């Protein structure tokens, strides 16, 4: 689960980390009250969306007067924000963050992420923070320091000395930087984060280290341990089908293809996506209904897949071990009877009650093609999608 910047800062503030004052506004009147209370003569207004690239895409506005702060708030509130990180979506801006300007001497980058290749957390640092960090990481990887961390969450003194030398910090700045790094690690581990990114961490002209922007992602599978964070979930920042899938308890990920998929089991679902690609097609979604889905869940899952206007073909791929093929068939019939028009449907059913399942589908009169193998089904689905 992604946090908004203001939520990330709320969390980091609880760890006594150095963050400039900020206010969140959902309206011009709230912004005006905050600006007057703080007596800010200038500042920055930032759209609160679950996406990077705000600085390059009009989501961050620097203002040099109280009037400009209000004008920036008015401009950003309720805009539809998109960037190369929004996966083609336009995200609504329902809140803005307002904070004072900071006199910056240097910008740094710090991130703690889960390195899945090495199966451990990694801290990454760069002397060149700011809006171009992605380009720097790609074109000048030598400017990015990566240090693997133990699962205990500790960082050792020799590692901190290495960081200070790499970042070219003097002793005073290094002491402050070490404190920040330790607190960031504590926050990362305490809250089961999968990403904690500070960009930029700035050295001010007064010699202070301050966090100007923060991005935090919490592991969805650990949210049951953090109900206070789960309450921060913002469904407005997600694809509506992703939101509905969560409400239905389904494992669903929207993709950009044209073949809608309903599969049971994550391994079979991923294999299905792979074989569709092998035959020259592409899936519109990943959807694992698991082994204990009810007829109602199957019906809603199929309706969810077909709500994507890009879907040209439905590929149902079920291996009924725990899953009952008759339940899948009944859910399919209920879903199709509620649809306007028809869509080409390819079905591979194997396992528990397969004959009964096929009988239910055939008796319903739903136009479909039964196949005997995964490869046959994928080839036919790709052909029908063209």
UniProtKB/Swiss-Prot annotation:
From the UniProt record, give the pathway where this protein acts.
Carbohydrate metabolism; tricarboxylic acid cycle; succinate from succinyl-CoA (ligase route): step 1/1
| Example GO biological process | tricarboxylic acid cycle
Annotated binding of substrate, by residue: 264, 321-323
**Cofactor annotation comment:** Binds 1 Mg(2+) ion per subunit.
Which parts of the sequence bind ATP?
A: 46, 53-55, 102, 107
Enzyme group, top EC level? ligase
Residue ranges of domain ATP-grasp in the record: 9-244
As recorded in UniProt, its EC number(s) are: 6.2.1.5
Stated role: Succinyl-CoA synthetase functions in the citric acid cycle (TCA), coupling the hydrolysis of succinyl-CoA to the synthesis of either ATP or GTP and thus represents the only step of substrate-level phosphorylation in the TCA. The beta subunit provides nucleotide specificity of the enzyme and binds the substrate succinate, while the binding sites for coenzyme A and phosphate are found in the alpha subunit.
Query: Which family does the UniProt entry place this protein in?
Result: Belongs to the succinate/malate CoA ligase beta subunit family.
Entry protein name: Succinate--CoA ligase [ADP-forming] subunit beta
- Phylogenetic placement of the source organism: Bacteria, Pseudomonadati, Chlamydiota, Chlamydiia, Chlamydiales
């Amino acid at each position: 689960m992604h946090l908004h910047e203001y939520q990330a800062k709320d969390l980091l503030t609880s760890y006594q980390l150095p963050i400039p004052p900020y206010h969140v506004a959902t309206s011009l009147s709230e912004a005006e009250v905050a600006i007057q209370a703080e007596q800010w003569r200038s500042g920055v207004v930032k759209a609160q969306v679950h996406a990077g690239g705000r600085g390059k895409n009009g989501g961050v506005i620097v203002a040099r007067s109280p009037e400009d702060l209000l004008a920036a708030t008015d401009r950003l509130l309720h805009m539809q924000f998109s960037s190369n990180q929004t996966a083609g979506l336009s995200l609504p801006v329902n809140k803005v963050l307002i904070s004072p300007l900071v006199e910056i001497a240097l910008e740094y980058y710090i991130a703690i992420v889960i390195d899945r290749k090495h199966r451990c957390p990694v801290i990454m640092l760069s002397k060149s923070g700011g809006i171009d960090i992605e380009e720097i990481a790609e074109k000048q990887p030598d400017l990015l320091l990566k240090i693997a961390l133990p699962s205990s969450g500790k960082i050792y003194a020799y590692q901190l000395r290495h960081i200070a030398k790499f970042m070219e910090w003097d002793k005073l700045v290094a002491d402050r930087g070490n404190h920040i790094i330790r607190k960031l690690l504590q926050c990362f581990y305490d809250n089961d984060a999968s990403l904690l990114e500070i960009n930029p961490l700035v050295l001010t002209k007064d010699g202070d280290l301050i966090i100007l922007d923060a991005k935090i992602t919490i592991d969805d599978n650990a949210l049951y341990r953090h109900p206070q964070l789960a309450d921060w979930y913002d469904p407005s920042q997600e694809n509506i089908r992703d939101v509905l899938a969560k409400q239905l308890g389904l494992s669903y990920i929207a993709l950009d293809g044209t073949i809608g998929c309903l599969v049971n089991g994550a391994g079979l679902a991923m294999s299905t996506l792979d074989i569709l690609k092998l035959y020259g097609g592409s899936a519109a979604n990943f959807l694992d209904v698991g082994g204990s889905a009810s007829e109602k869940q199957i019906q809603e899952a199929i309706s969810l897949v077909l709500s994507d206007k890009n879907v040209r073909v439905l590929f149902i791929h079920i291996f009924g071990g725990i899953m009952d093929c008759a339940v899948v068939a009944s859910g399919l019939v209920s879903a199709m009877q509620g649809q306007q028009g028809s869509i080409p449907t390819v079905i591979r059913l194997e396992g528990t009650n397969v004959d009964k399942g096929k009988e239910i589908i055939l008796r319903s009169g739903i136009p479909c093609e039964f196949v005997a193998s995964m490869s046959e089904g994928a080839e036919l689905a790709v052909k029908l999608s063209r």
